[in-house]
A protein has these predicted regions:
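Bacterial N-terminal signal peptides that target proteins for export
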Residues: 1-10
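Intrinsically disordered, low-complexity segments enriched in polar/charged small residues
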Residues: 10-13, 211
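Residue-level signal for mature regions of secreted extracellular proteins and peptides
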Residues: 14-15, 151
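C-terminal motif of bacterial Sec signal peptides marking the signal peptidase cleavage site
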Residues: 18-20
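An exposed, glycine/acidic-rich loop-and-rim segment of catalytic or binding clefts
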Residues: 22-226
Length: 226
């Protein structure tokens, strides 16, 4: 009888140990709110944390940037798979990669010679890349503070009004974008835009991924199937 009690005691202890292991929080390191709290262009800047499934993501409304994206690998070990800076100052002062994790636009990629004609009107834009206009010009969507419409556990909605004539582009362009995480560990980006006159729009996102985890070496041995 004593042996039976001892056996059940071992089983119970093992079960409790497994339960405790299964309920442990994933080992992730989040950027602090204090490191991203500031003001730019008269608007408040902060950082927002989203969680769903096994994924945790942090976004700042300065440039609508994804600054971290934590997800487990096949062994269950968590890594931050996007590159990002630890403080908002690094983004604002732009002492590194300008478009790191940001929304780019209102026209992503290059416009030859910084000029285009639309409905018979020629528009001239700032030149910022070897004689071309790149990713919206000198002050594109990556260098503005987005207004937060709503923030929940798994979704962040932001908007920005790109004014008529801003960086040379025609039309008041109202842009809304949504970052979402799903229970299936999906990371979604949804854009919408409306304008009050004909214009050119090509919105995009500029993350830098390292599926080994930030700081864990080169990506040259990555294999991607599309």
């Amino acid at each position: 009888m004593r042996k039976s009690k001892a056996l059940w005691g071992c089983v119970l202890a093992a079960a409790l140990l497994l339960a405790a292991c299964g309920s442990q929080e994933p080992k992730i390191t989040l950027f602090s709110n204090e490191a991203f709290q500031t003001e730019a262009d008269g608007k408040p800047v902060g950082i927002y944390t989203l969680r769903a499934g096994d994924v945790t993501m942090q976004v700042t409304n300065y440039g609508a940037r994804v600054v971290s994206l934590w997800t487990p690998d096949r062994a269950g070990d968590y890594e931050d798979i996007v590159l990002g800076y630890e403080t908002i100052d690094r983004y604002i002062n732009n002492d590194g990669e300008r478009f790191l994790g940001a929304v780019v636009g209102p026209y992503a990629n290059r416009i030859a010679k910084g000029s285009f004609t639309l409905d018979g009107t020629e528009y001239n834009l700032p030149i910022n890349n070897n004689g071309q206009t790149l990713h919206g010009g000198i002050d594109g969507l990556d260098r503005v503070v987005w207004d937060v419409v709503s923030a929940s556990e798994d979704q962040l909605v932001m908007k920005y009004l790109h004014a008529d004539g801003q960086e040379g582009f025609p039309g008041n362009l109202q842009i809304e974008m949504t970052y979402s995480l799903t229970p299936e560990n999906e990371f979604r980006i949804d854009y919408s835009a409306t304008t009050d006159k004909p214009t050119v729009v090509n919105l995009s996102h500029h993350p830098f991924f390292n599926l080994k985890g930030e700081g864990n070496g080169t990506i040259l041995d990555h294999v991607m199937t599309i």
